[in-house]
């Protein structure tokens, strides 16, 4: 990357890759994915350990829901149940909790949660679920009724940016600024997002403008905070004497002696950054990346 290095190659601060881009290796293809991953081997005499932050983004969202509640001195409905579940069981499954509260199956609960997190519209959600737009709309309404804190947090972060007193940025766990400095007319029509001076010149000084893409604010905050968790974890394991072989999204890969060695690395990763809910890492071990299985 000629403008910025790969260790900060994305807007959110997440690592980018090229030559090759390992983040784009096929993972869902049951034949091709493992075949390519079997080419990645540990050091001689050791095993490959893939250690990833379990449901990193949902945990961060739950953390911010708690932080938002404390800041407003008003608990977002439903968030305390998630906090307690995580504290009682660090391995708790966010999507199963959502599905149970909303009265839907886990697959739909997960799809809706991720759709809201990434700013997906009703039409795309309907395609993902294989249902009509009207059914998707009703399913989303039921979700918000039973699990209201997700929508309330999304709107809260968005409102923070749209406040006239806002500097146009929010900060991640480690203080990285997520900037929203493009503008467009405050209408329902589609407009190109522009820097403020250009937007005023294009649409006139009397046109009411709004910040663009604020509906993506929670997603940007969570992505930046995920990077703010993963990078300190990499530093901690390096200082402990283990250099990661790969870093793919929320996963670090190592050459390890045995399961106990992998568990020690997972412990370092889990404690690199403190949240209001406990972190948990899943461990897969095997003779290669493609043959690593959960332990």
Please give the residue ranges for each predicted region:
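Conserved catalytic core of nucleotide polymerization and phosphodiester-bond processing enzymes
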Residues: 1-295
């Amino acid at each position: 990357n000629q403008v910025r290095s790969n260790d900060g190659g994305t807007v959110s601060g997440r690592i980018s890759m090229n030559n090759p881009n390992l983040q784009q290796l096929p993972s869902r293809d049951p034949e091709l994915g493992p075949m390519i991953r079997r080419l990645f081997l540990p050091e001689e005499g050791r095993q490959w350990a893939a250690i990833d932050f379990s449901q990193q983004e949902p945990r961060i969202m739950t953390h911010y829901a708690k932080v938002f509640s404390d800041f407003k001195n008003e608990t977002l409905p439903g968030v305390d149940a998630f906090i307690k579940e995580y504290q009682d069981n660090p391995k708790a499954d966010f999507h199963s909790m959502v599905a149970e509260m909303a009265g839907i199956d886990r697959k739909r609960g997960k799809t809706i949660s991720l759709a809201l997190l990434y700013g997906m519209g009703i039409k795309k959600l309907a395609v993902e679920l294989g249902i009509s737009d009207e059914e998707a709309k009703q399913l989303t309404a039921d979700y918000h009724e039973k699990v209201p804190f997700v929508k309330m947090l999304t709107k809260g972060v968005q409102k923070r940016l749209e406040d006239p007193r806002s500097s146009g940025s929010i900060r991640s766990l480690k203080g990285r600024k997520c900037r929203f400095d493009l503008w467009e007319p405050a209408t329902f029509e589609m407009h190109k997002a522009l820097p403020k001076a250009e937007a005023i010149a294009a649409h006139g000084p009397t046109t009411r403008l709004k910040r663009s893409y604020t509906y993506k604010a929670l997603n940007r905050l969570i992505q930046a905070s995920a990077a703010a968790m993963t990078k300190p974890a990499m530093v901690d394991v390096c200082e402990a004497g283990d250099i990661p072989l790969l870093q793919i999204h929320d996963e670090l890969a190592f050459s390890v002696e045995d399961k106990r060695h992998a568990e020690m690395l997972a412990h370092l990763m889990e404690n690199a950054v403190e949240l209001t809910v406990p972190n948990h890492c899943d461990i897969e071990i095997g003779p290669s990346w493609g043959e690593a299985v959960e332990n």
